[in-house]
């Protein structure tokens, strides 16, 4: 985590998962952190919301909105990554932005916490159930673009200030979401109860 790598991951880059908010925060982040590199993972389709009414793709619409204020040589769109490469990316990421409307939490956020990456998440129901602000990550109001810029800039600038939060995130993930010791036994117990009833 020696490099200032900021990540954003979604199946598809669309408003439902906060792509528009993240892109609007990027110009100030990159202006404040001239060595930062941004890796954006996701395809340009739609998974949860609807397609743009005027046509086109959400990825391009929100990139075009801010591209004149970005150094595009520092913004890297990867498309979809296989699981192992995504996990590798989380291990080099200094900070990860995770936004979602109140909806199902993505498995990738849990994987990111498990990797010990600082997650700055939207203060929405599914995220706030997992991240406790200042304890195992940071929370920012979904539409607070300045809050996103400031919080992500600080995370890139002062990684030492977040060491304990990253460790707490790893510990919490292992304690609550480990497949072998927690999730699988709970699923088996649930199926056993259902079978008996």
Task: Go through the PLM ranges and name each one.
Residues 133-134, 138-145, 154-159:
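Conserved acidic donor-binding segment of nucleotide-sugar-dependent glycosyltransferases
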Residues 1-17, 23-28, 39-41:
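Conserved donor-binding/catalytic core segment of Leloir-type glycosyltransferases
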Residues 8, 91-104, 117:
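Acidic donor-binding loop of glycosyltransferase active sites
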